[in-house]
Amino acid sequence: MKTKAFAVFTALSVAVCSLGGAASTQTKAAPSKAAPVTIDMFTSPGSDIVNMDTNWFTKYAEKTFNMNIKWILAPNDPGTKQSLLLASGDYPAVFWSGGFTPAQELKYGQQGVLVPLNKYIQEYAPNLVQAMKTTPGMAQVMTAPDGNMYGIPQINYCWHCAWAAKYWINTRWLKELNLKMPSTPDELFNVLMAFKNHPPAGVKNVIPLDAGGPNGGAWHANLATFLMNAFIYDDETDFFTIQNGKVVFAPTQAGWKAGLTYIHKLYTNGLFSSEALTQNSTQYYGQVQQGRVGVFAEGGSNDAINYGQAGSDWQYWKTIPPLKGANGQSQAAFFGNGESNVVFAITNKATPDQIKAIMQLVNFVYTVRGTTMLDFGPQGKYWTPAKPGELGLTGHQALINVDWNTFYSGSARQNWGWDQQGPYDQSKAWRDGGVAIPATSPGGSATMLQQETVKNYAGHQPRYVFPASVWIQPSQVQQYSMLQTNINTFVNQWTDQFIVGTKDLNTDWNAYVQGVNNLGLSQYLQLSQSAMGKPFDTSSFKGEG
């Protein structure tokens, strides 16, 4: 499945609420005799779009908001093209779908290249103001330490994405071997041993536990993350935990050593192979699809399983709940900690009329209808109003029925929508508002993911986690990036070596911890603490989504 297709599928599975949104302010085009304002806009279109100039939503935006768009396109390597444009001084009035880290926002904001948006948001974009109040982490990624807002993010409120480090188990195997769903590390070990020693009838060359490598193309298929969380919090990315408001590096703590000891035990008992730490998605998914795997790591089982296909056992794959640790508590890695950057920015090349027109478009996009039209084009093409009685992901009356399966099928091309370009708002209302396919039906994998997440993962994250967006000062970016890369690379290398036994946890642990410290861990933590501001509060992420 293509990346964009998965992003829509994961957040949407098509979307409840109301098309305009009860609290939203619809932007309506006022009759105007003035000449359209011409705006240079940078964007990075997907390969599915035929032509941005003739695209239906381009024409709709131009007519509705009285503007002519001159596109600067970067379909390949947009980050490099954006940097070159900014360095040359010949940059556009608007970056519609660019990419600015907080440090870049500060850098170009302090240089006067990016225009503070505060007053324009208040004047022209009340829907965006409302979204900032209701979307966790949105204000944090938008508001720089100097109080200015230099950009706007994309919002993708994907419930099951927030707990993507999942383990999936074939419950048909459990039933055949008269086993219960494991709830602790010891119980999981016993289940895997049973799969190995007493494979179900007809299964040859069984693989009790499988996973994918970090650069293999699978989605959150890391073997260690789910397991490690039974011993210490592991967020899979920067390895930070928050203790009493302080940033702590998990991989040097005793809990990390205990987790590695357990994972090494699984390895030495032949419950997974070293390939599970490195293999690509083709190898990994192939093994699952051959029916040889009992448990596997993946954010969404639908990537590894031919969902709805006869003989694939798709209906038997269920999530293993987060394992309870020695304290009897369970926790899961959390990825809903806000957006890490912004995509939309206005530069000092923009005139007041250009700013007004483009901010009115942003305001429209920050509605359920606006985001749906931006993504898929006009009503009646790829989406229609839901019928009475059709339900959304959370079981309430749906509003929109989106044919995302056709829109994203194979190498299909279209010229109707912009397909997730720019500061769209795939909000909770948008996600919940689409007609849900029953979880046990072919094509119902998104509903299944929602249900599995609500049942087993939602609410099992720590109250406070490290935010996705942190404000590193421009003068410290290079140093911070070097520390982060060197430390995390070192940790990942030693973690794999501890797991397979080329490093010994008893004799080499102290050398490992010293190695991390020697790479500048203390300074890295100080910079992270300062840039964090305050931890991300996850308390709103619970319940039905």
Language model features by range: what are they?
Residues 104-119, 306-332:
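Ligand-binding "clamshell"
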Residues 44, 368-493:
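Conserved small-residue motifs centered on glycine
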Residues 96-97, 297-300:
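Short beta-strand and adjacent tight-turn residues that come in two discontinuous sequence segments
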Residues 118, 145-221, 241-287, 292, ...:
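Helix-loop-helix "hinge/cap" segment bordering the ligand-binding cleft or interdomain interface
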Residues 68-74, 275, 318-320:
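General small-molecule cofactor/ligand-binding pocket signal
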Residues 7, 18-190, 234-240, 247-251, ...:
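Conserved N-terminal structural module of periplasmic/extracytoplasmic solute-binding proteins
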Residues 313-335, 390-410:
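Extended amphipathic alpha-helical segments with heptad-repeat/coiled-coil character used for oligomerization
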Residues 1-7:
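Positively charged n-region of N-terminal signal peptides that target proteins for export
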